[in-house]
Amino acid sequence: MSHIIPYQILGCVNVRLAKFTAGTDVDEYHLTLCIDDKACHMSYAEQLRQLCAAFEIVRQQIKASPVFKRYFISDAANQTAMLMNYELTSPDYELSVIEQPPANGTQVALWCYLMTHINTKANTFGLYEVEHGSYRHLWSANNTAQAKTCSAQTKLLLNDYVMQLMNEGCTLRDNCVRTWFYVNDIDRDYKDMVKARNDVFYTQGMNRHTHFTVSTGIGSRQADNQIRCQMDSYAVCGLRQGQMRYLHAPEYLCPTADGMSFERGACIDYGDRRHVFISGTGSTDRNDDVVSQGDILGQCMRVWQNIEALLNEADCEMNDLQVLTCAIRDASDFHVVRQFLQKKTEHRIPYVLVNAHICKPGRLVEMECIAARKAKSSYPNF
């Protein structure tokens, strides 16, 4: 079951923490740290210092090990080096750094996924492994490739990932749960990225007759201005046939059979719990048309309905959400969207609200999330 740790402020850092426990060995935590509006005047160095100090306080309080961190920063070219000074001494979790500015005008935010009673290590072939029980969870982040076009970079990234998975005894088709593609110029290169992704998928037996992966494709710059695309990923080694299934909500969203090249969501059943991963979700209908064109609040409401429909298909509810990332295309929509999220979450769900270009111009807001629910099945425990 989920336990929401009381919302707190440490220095200038707003802390939101959700704990999930199934009463078995591994407890899970999702933590978001965001700089308070009142600290906008502080330097990046001071915001980062206070955020990292707050993280360490919370980590010691909950006595859990970080598995995956994602920093959202406002200027990757000038801020990444200082951030890495805090992170280079901690090699036992995966680290993602993306330029998606916190939407409240501050300069850095953090989402971190933590667990108890696990073993973590960096594997020889470049993936970070989290091992417990019958499973090995394989995380990868900040992957980039040297090529002239976004399409070529995407193919190189995915082909390299296919080989990394093969070296771990896994495949893209059977073990990859989720990918994130952060595209420098999403308005120009999104279609090329998608086509390149599909080209690699097809070589791995992934198509509209089989399945794709849960995914987010969204705008973000990297510290190196030659990088057109960055890829993060998550896979699970040890899954049995049928243990992961895909979510469609066809009455609300356009299905893969009609041309979508990513899964709207996926759920994985373990012996003691169910995990649900929801792709970046916009305000669209079953024909992939934008709902509430030009209306940010209307689009927020439709996104929420779409996510709820996907969760319901997995026999889950909005109360099962563990963490949510919300991106808005126009920073001036910040106050409306934050008020919407505050009303919907009531501080129950850790979230990060950032400013980023979304894959198609008419889509003003996009949300992705992770949910968990206590459940029993014949599969080994998480």
Per-segment meaning from a language model:
Residues 1-322, 328-382:
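N-terminal presequence-like segments and the immediate start of the first folded domain
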